[in-house]
Amino acid sequence: MSGWESYYKTEGDEEAEEEQEENLEASGDYKYSGRDSLIFLVDASKAMFESQSEDELTPFDMSIQCIQSVYISKIISSDRDLLAVVFYGTEKDKNSVNFKNIYVLQELDNPGAKRILELDQFKGQQGQKRFQDMMGHGSDYSLSEVLWVCANLFSDVQFKMSHKRIMLFTNEDNPHGNDSAKASRARTKAGDLRDTGIFLDLMHLKKPGGFDISLFYRDIISIAEDEDLRVHFEESSKLEDLLRKVRAKETRKRALSRLKLKLNKDIVISVGIYNLVQKALKPPPIKLYRETNEPVKTKTRTFNTSTGGLLLPSDTKRSQIYGSRQIILEKEETEELKRFDDPGLMLMGFKPLVLLKKHHYLRPSLFVYPEESLVIGSSTLFSALLIKCLEKEVAALCRYTPRRNIPPYFVALVPQEEELDDQKIQVTPPGFQLVFLPFADDKRKMPFTEKIMATPEQVGKMKAIVEKLRFTYRSDSFENPVLQQHFRNLEALALDLMEPEQAVDLTLPKVEAMNKRLGSLVDEFKELVYPPDYNPEGKVTKRKHDNEGSGSKRPKVEYSEEELKTHISKGTLGKFTVPMLKEACRAYGLKSGLKKQELLEALTKHFQD
């Protein structure tokens, strides 16, 4: 009997997606709670097209290249997010409310190759001329009207949005210096946007005499409490500086789930679970229709094998053979079997940090931070708990249930103290590292071959080699070369480039530099460790383990018909292992699948008939 989880499910169905998102939010699931939406608001006045030297890019060129970089990264990481490009300070206008000097180039939609190519036509000298012919330059704009147009773009979107942001690119620090009424309306409109959950980020560019943010934009932009203020107040003079600033603002902190931490029956606080490190993977392949090259939507239907009729979810049930009887389970019963506990963290006790060993590591840890959305006052109690755990050097042991249908984990909440750099900027946030603890079956005894201990002289020589090869390691300095080349190939296909850009493999060792540093240490180490006649390129003879015989094979196990019938009648056939069941099916010429349940059904049906 088949399951019912995917009845009439259509992948890509937007209505189903919205319903699924609401259900996942209610259950504390990991799935996203909506789409990110981002509007690039670019100043198109004449000053943005003037560079301070011939070798430098114009502020407008830097802005366009930054926007293209975000488009490409969004296509790779989250292609369901919504992006838009709006120019203000243009001679011509194009917007839904017919405001002057505002040109909406791209409305909020998914990023794609066509949009990147559309931006590409405005780069360089030829792009500047094309922009002049297509839109022109104007100065009689109102920033409040510009923000109004952006707010309308957000309101026209039918999807559920988790974050709504505007990135403003400009090199004009006082746009309404001669018109206090326009400046006042702009400040009011920016406050209205902030109240409705729309955040405005300033990407200010270098101008002659410097960019003074206090003249106007200090009251306009939105700054979170935990944000790096240097990112806001540093003006960008180079493309690398602007890219760094945009990347710092592009990614929003998104909780994997928001759960309740139960300290006891009466005291509950709400926390957010965050994933600080995520392994980068290739995106999954998408099935396309051969004739039109459009994505294929998968639909699942269940039919009766005897009549060919369509089965509804109420027509099917789950079954399990136990004790020679077929046990029928209803849908509610199977769901109840999967449900162990409500999503959340249950405090079980405290243990000293010294009891947490390195070999207890199972998987990357998560990060726990207080949330005020579910329980008001959680931050205060969370902070008190963190301080006491740091003082007493203990970890909180908890039972962690991430979702309703997931078995609970035993975890240790390891306290983490806040760290600041020399300029009092937060480097490490305060909170708890959620460390997954192993179960008994996760700990195994691994057979180790007997090793020959190194002599003190050999150890000393290796220490000297390691000391020579030391360098400052930064994880963000090394990229996965396979992934980088994969994305460059996709970029070349999407943008119709002649050939993809070759990715540099930064993981390869710098052999020449290493040899120069080590000098004669390598040869000295070889003389100490390896015998004189050692050939590193020679074939190594594989040693056989003591328990391995010379060509001995596992004998086949045969079962008599009476023995199998006895087990079937007593309902003990399920005690047989899968290899034993396969051998029995093979002996009687029975065709069956690879699963144990299918093997049991084949043997039972054969002997009962």
UniProtKB/Swiss-Prot annotation:
Residues 550-609 are annotated as: Interaction with DEAF1. Changing residue 164 to A: Abolishes adduct formation. The modification Phosphoserine is found at residues 2, 6, 27, 51, 306, 477, 520, 550, 560. Residues 1-28, 536-562 are annotated as: Disordered. Changing residue 160 to A: Abolishes adduct formation. One of its GO terms (cellular component) is DNA-dependent protein kinase-DNA ligase 4 complex. The modification N6,N6,N6-trimethyllysine is found at residue 570. Keywords: Acetylation, Activator, ADP-ribosylation, ATP-binding, Chromosome, Cytoplasm, DNA damage, DNA recombination, DNA repair, DNA-binding, Helicase, Host-virus interaction, Hydrolase, Immunity, Innate immunity, Isopeptide bond, Lyase, Methylation, Multifunctional enzyme, Nucleotide-binding, Nucleus, Phosphoprotein, Systemic lupus erythematosus, Transcription, Transcription regulation, Ubl conjugation. Transmembrane segments: none annotated. Residues 578-583 are annotated as: Interaction with BAX. Its main location: nucleus. Individuals with systemic lupus erythematosus (SLE) and related disorders produce extremely large amounts of autoantibodies to XRCC5 and XRCC6. Existence of a major autoantigenic epitope or epitopes on the C-terminal 190 amino acids of XRCC6 containing the leucine repeat. The majority of autoantibodies to XRCC6 in most sera from patients with SLE seem to be reactive with this region. This is X-ray repair cross-complementing protein 6. The gene is XRCC6.
